[in-house]
Amino acid sequence: MREMSAGPSRRSFLTRIGAGGLGALAAAPAVAQQTGKKSFWSQEYSAQKGAVKLYMYRKRREAPTRGERPLPVLFLVHGSSLSGRPTFDLNVPGHGDYSLMETFAGYGFDVWTMDFEGYGRSSRTEGNSDIAEGVRDLKAATDVVMRETGQRRLHFFGESSGGLRAGAFAIVYPDRVDRLVLAAFTYTGEVSPTLTDRAKQVEFYRANNRRPRDREMIRSIFTRDKPGTSDPAVGEALADAELPLGDSVPTGTYLDMSANLPVVDPLKVQAPVLLVRGEYDGIATEQDLINFFTKLPNRDRQLIVLPGMSHSVVLGLNRDQLWHVMKGFLQMPQRHDIRQNA
């Protein structure tokens, strides 16, 4: 990870955020949850990365049993401003289903997510939790997943900078990645309205390893590109879930996306890839994604634009479009014209 200056501004800012970190959960008590007519089993875990404890969360239809046939594993990778469970297991009473974890657990997947260093329930540190550090976090987390599930290769979904983390991980640990879904992804960031605006703060990101995050900032995720593509209740529910975990988040991914792109070389990504872009997403142009897509060496690849969607395809009004294309990609039948490895 790149070392950041430890100037007074960063230290004083860190003192305001409090401890925030969660101790090792190892395997916290499991919980059976009833959602409508469907029940789900869930459990908390922790991964250890040196002195850093990384919070992990798992959800599936039923509790695992000894000797069962392992389910396909889907690992969900969060973005720059929010942690794992609020992003992927959000409850918005009276406004429909928003939990990507429950949706794919219902499809028969063993679904996991985590909080990266400095986010949510994971340890607070003086690091900036950049993309390279995220790869190390994913290594520690997948060690736990592989131990608990017996699966050696996992499906990954990453949204926004979560896609950059997942893509970078797929390059470093290709043997752990089965199929890879990258949503709200950016390659070079050229002509990106969001990143052009964000780059105005690049010196702040260099000088400070954390940035403030309040309710209005969380709301803006759903309004900055195209108002009306998400339910206002989602931003409020997300803020309610996220703000008790802290009023700041690391700056590392913002710095990488403002000054260090590209961080994922498509020529080095071996896994099958699905690129998903919301029609109005300001983080990357279609041409930027096409340039990435055409360089991918695996011909098992798809690029899909979802109409009526903005940056957050996970939590948009038309999120069921994401579920549809993602399920089809993850359950793609094996090819019959090539010999499969034994």
Features from the language model and the residues they span:
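N-terminal secretory signal peptides
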Residues: 1-12
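N-terminal cap/lid segment of alpha/beta-hydrolase-fold proteins
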Residues: 35-66
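Short, surface-exposed "cap/lid" segments of acyl-processing enzymes
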Residues: 65-70, 74-106
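Conserved acidic catalytic loop of the alpha/beta-hydrolase fold
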Residues: 136-153
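Conserved hydrolase catalytic core segment
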Residues: 157, 161-188
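Alpha/beta-hydrolase
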Residues: 191-276
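Conserved alpha/beta-hydrolase "acid-adjacent" motif
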Residues: 282-288
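Catalytic histidine-centered segment of alpha/beta-hydrolase-like enzymes
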Residues: 309-319
